[in-house]
């Protein structure tokens, strides 16, 4: 069935009908659609457009329809154009055409669909936030479990400076919390109901948009009916946050993939979170991490496609906006697949801390410590940088590490390189010296774990909350 037709002499062509149908993706909004219809029935009743008996009959039919949708007894049919037309058909089957047809007064699919989408995105933002907090907690537990284990920190994928493995793991947890904060911040902009905007100009029937907003769990209704029906910036913002989550998961996954290679040998993944090869019996592949890396591109593509669809649209509604839903629906589905898998992979990973410790001091990763030791002795950093570089050159020419230079070789480079410099020529000494806030010193990392867990706890109220 269609919600239009009186102005037309005939029905749509088969090609147009096939192009227009959207129940294959918007059916997931059915529960929200029924909630909106119930709230709309309430304001029709309050405005005197439904008498008491009609309102009671309408609500009874809507409640029955919701039960049938949830149970699967009622589903969209091929002739239904979208979720709205399918549910109107279901309502009229339960309430009769006369009563069921009264619900359309004062609303348009234009305000209806964006209200449902906002409500759905608020719900999914909370659900995804809870899963992100779960992964952040697992990273904090792994960080606590590995204690003072060290690893070579890298820039440009080259040895840079030693850091605690815990510090490295926590560096992946903090972005996840910022993603949750982004979802929470977005909720303030999603928390505004477009119901009552009509097609674009509002309603002349004396309906109360604020009452509908309250019933649907929104704090307020939109102040401008044109903007209410046309705006999709909040959908694009959701898509950006979802894409950013994909990027953050991809960076974590890339590290796992590298660490899992035989050349690195830093981590062993549990069999239950790995796969094999159809031809090579020895293979144990980090497929979860690889899929996360690949799906990040898909999530970014969803965002790019949505933004391209929105570009240049005139006010108010245009059918182009039907294309706003599939990108974010796909992002939501992909993240709900990815997050439990990545969380399980990280939770069961075993880190080879001996191998990490073996590599942590290599690659002249203590050169900065030598330079900063000289600075503490009163040497200008420009000079200290040159002297430390000379130490690296001298060690490299002999195929050995900085700590292997003799006292005589150090003094020959510069008399200020006394034997006391050796106090910073150990990985442990280097790590302990980074004791400022945010640094990798053990006491700072222990404080960071506590701070992270407090931040997780503070965000739980959003991640576990439900919209009505």
Swiss-Prot record:
PROSITE patterns given in the database record: FUMARATE_LYASES
EC number of this enzyme: 4.3.2.1
GO cellular component: a single term: cytosol
Alphabetical list of Pfam families matching this protein: ASL_C2, Lyase_1
Protein's cellular compartments: Cytoplasm
GO molecular function terms noted in the UniProt entry: argininosuccinate lyase activity
Pathway(s) served: Amino-acid biosynthesis; L-arginine biosynthesis; L-arginine from L-ornithine and carbamoyl phosphate: step 3/3
Chief localization: cytoplasm
Keywords of the record: Amino-acid biosynthesis, Arginine biosynthesis, Cytoplasm, Lyase
Broad enzyme group: lyase
Reaction catalyzed: 2-(N(omega)-L-arginino)succinate = fumarate + L-arginine
Record flagged with keyword Iron: no
InterPro entries on file: Arg_succ_lyase_C, Argininosuccinate_lyase, Fumarase/histidase_N, Fumarate_lyase_CS, Fumarate_lyase_fam, Fumarate_lyase_N, L-Aspartase-like
GO term, biological process aspect, one: L-arginine biosynthetic process
Disulfide bonds: none
Annotated family: Belongs to the lyase 1 family. Argininosuccinate lyase subfamily.
NCBIfam families: argH (TIGR00838)
Full protein name: Argininosuccinate lyase
Species this protein is from: Cutibacterium acnes (strain DSM 16379 / KPA171202)
Gene name of this polypeptide: argH
């Amino acid at each position: 069935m269609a919600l239009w037709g009186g102005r037309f002499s005939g029905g749509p062509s088969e090609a147009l009908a096939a192009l227009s149908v959207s129940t294959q993706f918007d059916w997931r909004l059915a529960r929200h659609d029924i909630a909106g219809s119930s709230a709309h029935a309430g304001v029709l009743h309050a405005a005197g457009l439904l008498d008491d008996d009609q309102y009671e009959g309408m609500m009874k039919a809507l409640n029955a329809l919701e039960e049938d949708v949830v149970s699967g007894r009622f589903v969209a049919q091929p002739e239904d154009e979208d979720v709205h037309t399918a549910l109107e058909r279901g309502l009229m089957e339960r309430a009769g055409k006369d009563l069921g047809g009264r619900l359309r007064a004062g609303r348009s699919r234009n305000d209806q669909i964006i209200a449902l989408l906002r409500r759905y995105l608020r719900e999914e933002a909370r659900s995804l936030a809870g899963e992100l907090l779960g992964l952040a907690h697992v990273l904090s537990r792994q960080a606590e479990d590995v204690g003072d284990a060290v690893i070579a920190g890298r820039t440009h994928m080259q040895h840079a400076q030693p850091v605690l493995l815990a510090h490295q793991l926590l560096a992946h947890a903090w972005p996840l919390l910022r993603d949750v904060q982004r979802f929470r911040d977005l909720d303030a902009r999603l928390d505004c109901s477009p119901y009552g905007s009509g097609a674009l100009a509002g309603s002349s029937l004396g309906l109360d948009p604020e009452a509908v907003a309250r019933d649907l769990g929104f704090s307020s209704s939109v102040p401008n009916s044109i903007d209410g029906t046309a705006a999709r910036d909040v959908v694009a913002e959701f898509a950006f946050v979802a894409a950013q989550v994909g990027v953050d998961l991809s960076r974590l996954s890339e590290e796992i993939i590298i660490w899992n290679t035989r050349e690195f040998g830093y981590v062993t993944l549990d069999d239950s979170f790995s796969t094999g090869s159809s031809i090579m019996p020895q293979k144990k592949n980090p497929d979860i991490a690889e899929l996360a890396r690949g799906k990040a591109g898909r999530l970014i593509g969803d965002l790019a496609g949505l933004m391209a669809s929105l570009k240049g649209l005139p006010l108010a509604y245009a059918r182009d906006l039907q294309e706003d839903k599939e990108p974010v629906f796909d992002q939501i589905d992909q993240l709900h697949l990815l997050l439990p898998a990545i969380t399980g992979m990280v939770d069961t990973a075993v880190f080879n801390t001996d191998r990490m410790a073996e590599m942590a001091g290599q690659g002249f990763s203590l050169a900065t410590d030598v330079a900063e030791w000289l600075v503490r002795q009163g040497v200008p950093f420009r000079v200290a940088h040159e002297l430390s570089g000379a130490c690296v050159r001298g060690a490299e020419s002999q195929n050995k590490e900085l700590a292997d230079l003799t006292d005589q070789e150090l003094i020959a480079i510069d008399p200020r390189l006394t034997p006391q410099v050796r106090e910073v020529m150990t990985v442990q000494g280097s790590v302990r010296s980074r004791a400022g806030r945010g640094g990798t010193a053990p006491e700072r990392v222990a404080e960071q774990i506590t701070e992270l867990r407090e931040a997780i706890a503070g965000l739980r109220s959003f991640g576990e909350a439900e919209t009505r």
